[in-house]
Amino acid sequence: MIETDRLITPAPLSLKEEDLERALRPKHLAEYIGQEKIRGQLQIFIEAARRRREALDHVLLFGPPGLGKTTLAHIVAKEMGVGLRQTSGPVLERPGDLAALLTNLEPNDVLFIDEIHRLSPVVEEILYPALEDYQLDIMIGEGPAARSVKLDLPPFTLVGATTRAGMLTNPLRDRFGIISRLEFYSVEELTQIVMRSAALLGADISPDGATEIARRSRGTPRVVNRLLRRVRDFAEVKAEGRINRQVADAALLMLDVDAIGLDVMDRKLLLTVMEKFGGGPVGVDNLAAAISEERGTIEDVLEPYLIQQGYMKRTPRGRMATSIAYQHFGLALPRNGLSADLWDEKQ
């Protein structure tokens, strides 16, 4: 299965979905649900910057995909009352690409760079003086006649977003004054998001129906909104448009999303560890070959949620399924030496 085919992938599935996301996106911090600590901090920092009529300190947002990093970047610009320029690390291939963006910023504007960990080293070098001194060093000419010219930039705020904070270089990370990690959302928070999105979409949904969708959404707002749209389609055809717990359950089972939010790929990964490798430990390369997936897909897409929920763990010797995973699938715990710690965990 291709990652972009997964209903519960935290990545956007299409440009159309990105348009739908924008329609559901909160515009102000007061409308933003979840991430209370980050929201409270930003509220104070933004208000202080506005009172001083200064640019907000540079902001780094990191965490798994689909948790609202882009939404927060838009909210920062909206709350500051300034413009927003948006791009991504892979798009900025040459120093000139970044220079064109920076020289067109208005005072206190927000520049949002998604996937900032994928900036090329040569572009990153240009960014350092821009962040620290609001200056741009550019080379004019070539060879012996080349010379460096400094251009003054207006004060601005860089909002960087990344799913791989560990891949940022130390010099770049050190230039951010505000660094925040986004966490997975609780079922209660996701239920509020479902109710809000359903109202915007004109969907008729009960609180228990919203909770049923929320608890299968892997702690991710992007996933919960996607599941809501699919359940709405099911309800319009099968239940006269009314979404309750039974309708949501039937729709999600039809979509192959089980009671804890696992899909075919999740179940395949866990069952491979348990049935083919005796519960582990198994190296990630062997596991990738066994399920015909790329190593990066396992590490970046499949594992984070499974580990966070306690169904799998990383050890120095490889990946292991936990007793919780065995219980979920109704399988007996292995009694071999390799998985002895599963028995310790069970006890």
From Swiss-Prot:
Binding site for DNA: 295, 314, 319
InterPro entries tied to this protein: AAA+_ATPase, AAA_lid_4, DNA_helicase_Holl-junc_RuvB, P-loop_NTPase, RuvB-like_N, RuvB_C, WH-like_DNA-bd_sf, WH_DNA-bd_sf
Binding site for Mg(2+): 70
GO terms of biological process kind: DNA recombination; DNA repair
SMART domains hit by this protein: AAA
Location of region: Large ATPase domain (RuvB-L): 4-185
Gene Ontology CC entries for this record: cytoplasm; Holliday junction resolvase complex
Chain residue ranges for the region called Small ATPAse domain (RuvB-S): 186-256
Keyword annotations from UniProtKB, A to Z: ATP-binding, Cytoplasm, DNA damage, DNA recombination, DNA repair, DNA-binding, Hydrolase, Nucleotide-binding
Main location: cytoplasm
Compartment(s): Cytoplasm
Top-level lineage group: Bacteria
Pfam families: AAA_lid_4 (PF17864), RuvB_C (PF05491), RuvB_N (PF05496)
Chain residue ranges for the region called Head domain (RuvB-H): 259-347
Residues binding ATP, per UniProt: 24-25, 66, 69-71, 132-134, 175, 185, 222
Catalytic reactions on record: ATP + H2O = ADP + phosphate + H(+)
MF terms in GO: ATP binding; ATP hydrolysis activity; four-way junction DNA binding; four-way junction helicase activity
EC number(s) on file: 3.6.4.-
Role of this protein: The RuvA-RuvB-RuvC complex processes Holliday junction (HJ) DNA during genetic recombination and DNA repair, while the RuvA-RuvB complex plays an important role in the rescue of blocked DNA replication forks via replication fork reversal (RFR). RuvA specifically binds to HJ cruciform DNA, conferring on it an open structure. The RuvB hexamer acts as an ATP-dependent pump, pulling dsDNA into and through the RuvAB complex. RuvB forms 2 homohexamers on either side of HJ DNA bound by 1 or 2 RuvA tetramers; 4 subunits per hexamer contact DNA at a time.
Record text about domains: Has 3 domains, the large (RuvB-L) and small ATPase (RuvB-S) domains and the C-terminal head (RuvB-H) domain. The head domain binds DNA, while the ATPase domains jointly bind ATP, ADP or are empty depending on the state of the subunit in the translocation cycle. During a single DNA translocation step the structure of each domain remains the same, but their relative positions change.
Family statement drawn from the similarity comment of this UniProt entry: Belongs to the RuvB family.
Assembly description: Homohexamer. Forms an RuvA(8)-RuvB(12)-Holliday junction (HJ) complex. HJ DNA is sandwiched between 2 RuvA tetramers; dsDNA enters through RuvA and exits via RuvB. An RuvB hexamer assembles on each DNA strand where it exits the tetramer. Each RuvB hexamer is contacted by two RuvA subunits (via domain III) on 2 adjacent RuvB subunits; this complex drives branch migration. In the full resolvosome a probable DNA-RuvA(4)-RuvB(12)-RuvC(2) complex forms which resolves the HJ.
Identification of the protein by name: Holliday junction branch migration complex subunit RuvB
Organism from which the protein derives: Nitrosospira multiformis (strain ATCC 25196 / NCIMB 11849 / C 71)
